[in-house]
């Protein structure tokens, strides 16, 4: 199960948690993915899409 948007290809970002003592530990920020039924290439499929693609209308939800 990949954590990548099937429309825009947005995936995880990598960085560090930084404490007050300036200690750094690596961490990952995941995109807000939703599993929705959408029309893709004329067929209804269940796809993982980020909320930005849903809000901006890049995806048409199946009824």
UniProtKB/Swiss-Prot annotation:
Cellular component GO terms held in the UniProt record: ribonucleoprotein complex; ribosome
NCBIfam families recorded: L28 (TIGR00009)
Key words of the record: Ribonucleoprotein, Ribosomal protein
Assigned protein family: Belongs to the bacterial ribosomal protein bL28 family.
GO-annotated biological processes: translation
Name of the protein this chain belongs to: Large ribosomal subunit protein bL28
Domain of life, per lineage: Bacteria
Pfam families to which the protein is assigned, alphabetical: Ribosomal_L28
Record-linked SUPFAM superfamilies: L28p-like
GO-annotated molecular function: structural constituent of ribosome
Source organism (scientific name): Geotalea uraniireducens (strain Rf4) (Geobacter uraniireducens)
């Amino acid at each position: 199960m990949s954590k990548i948007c099937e429309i825009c290809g947005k995936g995880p970002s990598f960085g560090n948690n930084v404490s007050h003592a300036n200690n750094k530990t690596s961490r990952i920020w995941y995109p807000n993915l939703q599993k929705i039924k959408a029309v893709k290439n004329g067929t209804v499929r269940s796809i993982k899409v980020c909320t930005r693609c849903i809000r901006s209308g890049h995806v048409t939800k199946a009824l």
